[in-house]
Amino acid sequence: LQVTARAVTAEELAAALGDGTFSLAGTEVRALGSDAECFLLQWASTSQENVSRYANSAYDTLLSVIAGAEDETARLGCLHDAEALLLEEGAVAPLYTTVTAWTLRDGLTGVLRDGRGWFSFAAVVPRSE
């Protein structure tokens, strides 16, 4: 496979992504929330953000299960399965990522982060030495 990169304007890229007239495109993908579900929703078959036109009923079913999951362990398992489908079927090919860094002041402990990416500081207490 030989690829020749060609620069395009933002308008040309948006048009090509919108109507599917591309073979390979490099674009920034962001989630609207700090949770894997927010990221994965972009490839649901009904999503307008699904520029790759990825369609897989098993993937859509996993997203439905994830959305209604009350058991955090089951939800995380489904998130991993959905991500694996995207990667195995070549719907996405991540090249790099940026991350959100955070830290808790020395001497404190107890911050919690749930499976949806939300932080809870209700249990933060001074660290016992």
Residue spans of the language-model regions?
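Solvent-exposed, polar/charged alpha-helical surfaces in well-ordered, non-transmembrane soluble domains
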Residues: 11, 15, 19, 57-64, ...
